[in-house]
């Protein structure tokens, strides 16, 4: 008897889905699910999504900060520092988040949809947006 989607039920011949592998199950005639079973795959997907969202957020913030300081001498360095900080933060938070949610799903013996790392990366970048406001950052 097959149990609900557990780690013990990894399909024979399972191949890790390609990177985004996001599927939309509603009104899809070719309903093709994509699940992650191994912690290394969960880590990779989490890291990629976090780097994508952090890159977009910090490049945009760096361009805006550089444009507001364009008449001063160090405006290019502002952009470089934003991008560097976004990359380092994306690498660390993506790694921690990937291994953490991978361990949680593994301990529950569940497989993970490819949407979960995307949603975790969105939550992480929204947390950065909330902390970017000075009043909220000083309260926390």
From Swiss-Prot:
Transmembrane region(s): 45-65, 76-96, 116-136
Similarity annotation: Belongs to the TMEM170 family.
Subcellular location: Membrane
Statement: the UniProt record of this protein carries the keyword Glycoprotein: yes
Membrane topology summary: Multi-pass membrane protein
UniProt-listed GO biological process terms: cellular response to hydrostatic pressure
Source organism per UniProt: Saccharomyces cerevisiae (strain ATCC 204508 / S288c) (Baker's yeast)
Identification of the protein by name: Uncharacterized protein YPR153W
Domain of life, per lineage: Eukaryota
Signal peptide location: none
């Amino acid at each position: 008897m097959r149990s609900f989607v557990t780690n013990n039920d990894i399909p024979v011949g399972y191949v890790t889905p390609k990177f985004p592998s996001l599927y939309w199950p509603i009104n899809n005639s070719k309903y093709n699910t994509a699940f992650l079973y191994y912690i290394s795959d969960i880590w990779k997907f989490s890291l990629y999504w976090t780097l994508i969202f952090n890159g977009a957020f910090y490049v945009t913030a760096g361009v805006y900060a550089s444009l507001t300081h364009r008449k001063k001498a160090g405006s290019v360095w502002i952009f470089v520092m934003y991008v560097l900080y976004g990359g380092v933060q994306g690498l660390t938070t993506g790694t921690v988040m990937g291994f953490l949610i991978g361990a949680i799903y593994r301990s529950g013996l569940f497989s993970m949809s490819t949407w979960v790392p995307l949603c975790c990366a969105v939550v992480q970048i929204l947390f950065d947006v909330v902390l970017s406001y000075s009043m909220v950052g000083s309260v926390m």
